[in-house]
C-alpha cells in the first residue's frame, strides 16, 4: 500500500496532561502513523509529543502530518466529514466498521477522536459514530490500533514509507536498521539480477 497523504484519516487526541500523558499521547501519534492514518492533531500543550512524532516521521518516513491546536472543540464541530469517537460506551466495533468503511472511507475525511482525559458529553453528541472496542476499560492506544486495523482490513501493514532515513529490516531474531539509501540500492541490484 503506497502512502498518499491526502489526510483522509486524521486522529485527534482530546486532552493532554503534560508530564502524566506525554508517553501515551506520543504513542497515539506513533500508532496513528504506523497503522494508516494521514495525520494526528494534538492539543496545543502536547509540544513534546508532537516533536517526537515529527522526528520519527523524518527518520522513518511518511507522509504523515503532525499538528497542534488550542481549539479541539472547534476542530470537531467544524470537521467537514465523518467524526468517529472511540469510547468504551459506544457501539461495538465489529458491528459498525464495515458500514463506516463502505460509506465513509475514501468518500469523505474521517476524524477519529481519542480521549486523553474525561471527554465532555458534547463530544458524544458531535460524533457521527461513538465506537467501542470491547465495551471494557483499556488503553486508548489499543482501541485506536484495533479500529484502524479493522478499518483498513490489514492493508496498512503493507505501507511503503517515503523519505525515510532509516529502514528496519524484518528478521526472525535480532535487530537490524539500515540507511534507506542502502536499502534502495540493494533493491535495485536485486531487480537487475
UniProtKB/Swiss-Prot annotation:
Q: Which UniProt keywords apply?
A: Cytoplasm, Methyltransferase, S-adenosyl-L-methionine, Transferase, tRNA processing
Provide the top EC class. transferase
> What GO CC terms are in its UniProt record?
cytoplasm
Its Enzyme Commission number(s) read: 2.1.1.206
What is the annotated localization of this protein? Cytoplasm
Chief localisation class: cytoplasm
Q: Which Pfam families match?
A: Trm56 (PF01994)
Where on this chain does S-adenosyl-L-methionine bind? 86, 115-119
Subunit structure, interactors included: Homodimer.
Q: What does this protein do?
A: Specifically catalyzes the AdoMet-dependent 2'-O-ribose methylation of cytidine at position 56 in tRNAs.
Task: State the name under which the record lists this protein.
Answer: tRNA (cytidine(56)-2'-O)-methyltransferase
